[in-house]
Amino acid sequence: MQIVGSRPARALFFPEDEAEPVQELAYFLRRRDIPFMQLSHTTDHTVWRLGEHIRLQAFRTQHLGQEFYEVPHVCYRISFDGREVLFTADTDYLHETLAQISGTALEAAFVNPLFFQALFDKRLFHGALEAKYICVYHIPFREDDRMHMRESVRRRLTAPGAEHLRVLPLSEPYQQIKL
């Protein structure tokens, strides 16, 4: 709530959840007249227009890791200036195929390091994710990288099969990219 309170926000989207912090956020937004949408099965695949040239679609997917199966999870598809971008967050790539975006020409797909690894192994990811750029995010900072994700991503960049991909690893604080 500190971030929302200190920056101008025109609207917020977040998964519907009965957890107290989520309810407190909704209360906070109502008091400040900031529009918000709690995403649920009833909003799945709805497309929102956010200005003249921006569209947002959120669709539910399974969260990665059996211990998180009850955690509400969504992917975000954002369209702007004729480009399509997908944020997969912690989608369960072992069971999801992302058929929702099949046939979509993605400018960029944002995947976490584990999903990035799975893109190279059809035994792990059974779908197709075709994008001009694969942006690897959720890479831990050096001091937090107990599972050596940074090194794993770095090695995969030069492994067989990666030569045809345009990969943008996002691993540094405040790092910016241009698509």
Stretches found by the model and what they are:
Residues 33-51, 98-103, 122-179:
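Binuclear metal-ion centers of metallo-dependent hydrolases, dominated by the metallo-beta-lactamase
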Residues 1-8, 23-27, 145-153:
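Metal-dependent catalytic neighborhoods of phosphoester/phosphodiester hydrolases
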